[in-house]
């Protein structure tokens, strides 16, 4: 690689081959022409000669506005970045002896997160003597699993880590 290498396709005097396959500014194939002839046609049209397919034999070049081409490729790249959805992991914290209404509120939040396409980590925290009743926590997580089975799949089965039990669910 030379230190003067530029970003993007080669254009005008940077194209160092004797002959190119030329596509004019209307998109019509002109056939194989010499590089001097192609550069003259580009200058006559007031546009640039841009290498489109450098690996072809001879390379395919097109007469277009280089600034416009760079703008369109940047715009296309920005559009694809915008369309990408970043999946987040949302966390819902519950206790083993959660009340009916509180459970309903937490379940509604889980449904909302799943509908938005995010993963949900359900964390069940045990305090003091609650560690002796881990079966209650497991039953609660099984209940969450059953209540969300239509819209979500289990990504990480319920497991105990220290004083808390956790489970991760993801959209189907």
From Swiss-Prot:
Monomer. It is found in: Cytoplasm. GO terms for cellular component: cytosol; membrane. One of its GO terms (molecular function) is translation initiation factor activity. Keywords: Cytoplasm, Initiation factor, Protein biosynthesis. IF-3 binds to the 30S ribosomal subunit and shifts the equilibrium between 70S ribosomes and their 50S and 30S subunits in favor of the free subunits, thus enhancing the availability of 30S subunits on which protein synthesis initiation begins. This is Translation initiation factor IF-3. Coiled coil: none annotated. GO terms for biological process: ribosome disassembly. The keyword Protein biosynthesis applies. Disulfide bonds: none annotated. InterPro entries: T_IF-3_C_sf (IPR036788), T_IF-3_N_sf (IPR036787), Translation_initiation_fac_3 (IPR001288), Translation_initiation_fac_3_C (IPR019815), Translation_initiation_fac_3_N (IPR019814). The gene is infC. Its main location: cytoplasm. Signal peptide: none annotated. NCBIfam families: infC (TIGR00168). Belongs to the IF-3 family. It holds the Pfam family IF3_C. HAMAP family: IF_3.
């Amino acid at each position: 690689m030379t230190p003067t290498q530029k970003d993007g396709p080669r254009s005008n005097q940077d194209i160092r081959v004797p002959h190119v396959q030329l596509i004019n500014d209307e998109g019509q194939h002109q056939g194989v022409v010499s590089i001097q002839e192609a550069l003259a046609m580009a200058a006559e049209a007031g546009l640039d000669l841009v290498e489109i397919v450098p690996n072809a034999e001879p390379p395919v070049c097109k007469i277009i506005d280089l600034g416009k081409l760079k703008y369109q490729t940047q715009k296309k790249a920005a559009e694809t970045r915008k369309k990408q959805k970043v999946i987040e992991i949302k966390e819902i914290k519950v206790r083993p002896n959660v009340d009916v209404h509180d459970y309903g509120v937490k379940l509604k939040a889980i449904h909302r997160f799943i509908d938005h396409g995010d993963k949900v980590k359900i964390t069940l925290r045990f305090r003091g003597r609650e560690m002796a009743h881990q079966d209650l926590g497991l039953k609660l997580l099984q209940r969450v699993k059953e209540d969300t089975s239509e819209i979500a799949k289990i990504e990480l089965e319920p497991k105990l880590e220290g004083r808390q039990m956790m489970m991760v669910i993801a959209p189907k």
